[in-house]
């Protein structure tokens, strides 16, 4: 955002005597400070001259320019707004004011100021970005057509590609510019950032190294390096990369401090999230998403939903997270509407051209079919990236359910037993599906042991019902009878007696057929005696008679 220098910024023939000159100390010229990008020094010089009455024309514009490049947008705004109130205000001031509004997030004001400026490439680039902010595709394409094959315009286009998740298109532009301008080192950071977004973390590191060799203390580059380490290794390795930043970040670079604090929360697995992330929600875009993830991990689905419900998703990550939150809330509330919204979000991402062949895209399609209960389709997608998630508990949980739901309970059992998370292993969905797998795989005793480890609750009652009914269907009458016996004691429902009676008769038949040990009859009689039904005595009499005839001790 360079200001026109049609009028000299320093020394227009007016000579002033300065006491410090007499002492032989040379005051630096504004041009020298600007060429060195010493914006703090430039502001100091301009304010000093203003204070001693040596203020020159356009001083306020130069202060605004320097403040803008220091990231002090409020100060820049103050200077530019004052400049627009002057007579014969240069129309170029309006585009500088508009850029300042833009960086303050005041997009409506930025657009109004931008249209007051004279037409220029900078004005077009600004309006191009505003059209993206407003999701106005018609205006976006209109300003896109005005872009020229010059570096600034092409960088602006690459930026829009990046923000629209068109990372490869952005990379192509950056690489083309770098071919002719090797000195534009910072473009390597942009390329590395694109590769990071494409999940090519090792490639991102290689490209980033080119820049860090020349600028080893770059805040943005070191932060990106830390993020790559987080993805490639773990949070501890990433935190080590940030240590030098935490030690050296200047007090004036407040955004860097906020970025570091934000990323440390992520690297530490959410530690300190409630203290750090809420104030950053409207400062760092990812802060809102990471706070939502934190709430989900704490099982606070309602808070997660409250934080994301008004967010209009524009990136795959935002669509995915809205899908996850709606799915979780739908399950918690039994809401079909939320489940349908989740399914639509997942389908939108998984079916998009840019995401369909990525792992997140395939995860979305698996989730979509999971919600539709089309488990054969779920497995097609899960199998396509299974090798990347062998030790991932969440993947194994979903994979096991899909396998069990399609009747492959043997592989379902294997996947369930790979899960390490104690929280997940105590979840009723896990317990009920694993119990079902055990029963279908002719291991009813293991299913019964799952129940014995549970405390008395509504969930343990439900698991008893599952064991009782599924064991009955599978002809595993002994554990079916035991389950129906406990159910009958907890709830004198006639249906439980009928189930228990049928299971006991089933065991008796299996004993007669030699498919069950004769000693089991003693326990069957014990189960029957615990019921006060009139049919019990008749059943016991028949069983005792058979036992006597077959010399079975009861």
Swiss-Prot record:
Keywords: Cell projection, Ciliopathy, Cilium, Disease variant, Protein transport, Repeat, TPR repeat, Transport. It comes from the Eukaryota. TPR repeats lie at residues 57-90, 92-125, 151-184, 468-501. It holds the Pfam family ANAPC3. GO terms for cellular component: centrosome; ciliary basal body; ciliary base; ciliary tip; cilium; intraciliary transport particle B; neuron projection. Residues 1-24 are annotated as: Disordered. InterPro entries: TPR-like_helical_dom_sf, TPR_rpt, TTC26. It is found in: Cell projection, Cilium. GO terms for molecular function: intraciliary transport particle B binding. GO terms for biological process: axoneme assembly; cilium assembly; intraciliary anterograde transport; intraciliary transport; intraciliary transport involved in cilium assembly; manchette assembly; protein localization to cilium; protein transport. Its main location: other. Belongs to the IFT56 family. It is linked to Biliary, renal, neurologic, and skeletal syndrome: An autosomal recessive ciliopathy with multisystemic manifestations including severe neonatal cholestasis that progresses to liver fibrosis and cirrhosis, postaxial polydactyly, hydrocephalus, retinal abnormalities, and situs inversus. Additional features may include congenital cardiac defects, echogenic kidneys with renal failure, ocular abnormalities, joint hyperextensibility, and dysmorphic facial features. Some patients have global developmental delay. Component of the IFT complex B. Interacts with IFT46; the interaction is direct. Component of the intraflagellar transport (IFT) complex B required for transport of proteins in the motile cilium. Required for transport of specific ciliary cargo proteins related to motility, while it is neither required for IFT complex B assembly or motion nor for cilium assembly. Required for efficient coupling between the accumulation of GLI2 and GLI3 at the ciliary tips and their dissociation from the negative regulator SUFU. Plays a key role in maintaining the integrity of the IFT complex B and the proper ciliary localization of the IFT complex B components. This is Intraflagellar transport protein 56. It comes from Homo sapiens (Human).
